[in-house]
Amino acid sequence: MGKTQALRRKHLSGLDLRRYLYKRRTVVHRLTAESVGLGILLAVVGGFLDAYTYVSRDGVFATSQTGNLVLLGVEVAHGQWTQGLRHIPPLFAFVLGVAVAEGLKHPHITRTFPHPARTVLLLESIVLVIVGTWPVQVPNMIVTITIAFVASVQISSFRTLVQWPYNSAMVTGNLRTAAQAAYTALVLHDRKGLLQLLDFTLIIISFLLGALIGTLTTLHWGTRAIWFASGILLCAMLVLKANPKTLLNKS
C-alpha cells in the first residue's frame, strides 16, 4: 500500500510538473498578462518609476508604499511634520488605483473595454507621457500622487507570473518567493522550484535594472525621462496577445 501511494504521488507530481512546463512554455513565448516577458517589462517600469520620483521629486517613492510609511514614521519621530505629511497623499492615490483596477473587471466596463489589460497599459502610458510634459514648477506632490495612482493600477491588474502570485512593481514579496523557490530547488531537488526561482530572479533583476535606468535617465534628461517608461508600456500594449479570457488577472 505504501509503495502504491508513493508511486501515485510521484505520478501526480510529474503530471503537475508537465502542466506547469506547458503553461510556462506558452506564456514565455507569447506576451500575455501572465507571461514572464510582460512581467520583465512591468518590473523594469516599476523600478524606473520609484527611481524617477525619488531622484526628481523630493525623495518620495511612487510605488513602494512601505517606504513611504517608513519615511513618514521617521520624519514624524524627528518632529518634521511638514516633511512627513508629504508621504500621505501617495498612499491615498495608491488606494484609489486599486479601486480603479477592480472597477475595470466589472461586466459593464468590460463590454466597453473588452481587453482590460491593454486598457491598463494604454492608460499608464498616456498618463506618464502627460507627466513628462509637466515643468519642474509643478508641485512634486501632484507628480508623485499621479504616478502612485498609475503604479497601483498596474500592480492590481497584473498579479500572476505563469501561475504564481507576484508583484509587478515591488520586490519584497518577489524576493521571498524566490528564496522559497531556491530552497525547494536546491534542498528538495524540485525542478518546478528551479524554474520558479529562475522566473522570479529575472523579475527581481529587471526591477533593479529599471531603477538603474530610471536614475541615470532622470539625472540626464530630467522630468522627461519618464517617457522612457511610457514607451515600454506602449510597446507591451501593442504586442500583448489579445485574449480577453487571460489578459487580466481576476483573482
Task: Show where each model-derived region lies.
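N-terminal acidic, proline/glycine-rich, low-complexity intrinsically disordered segments
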Residues: 1-6
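Alpha-helical transmembrane segments of multi-pass membrane proteins
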Residues: 8-251
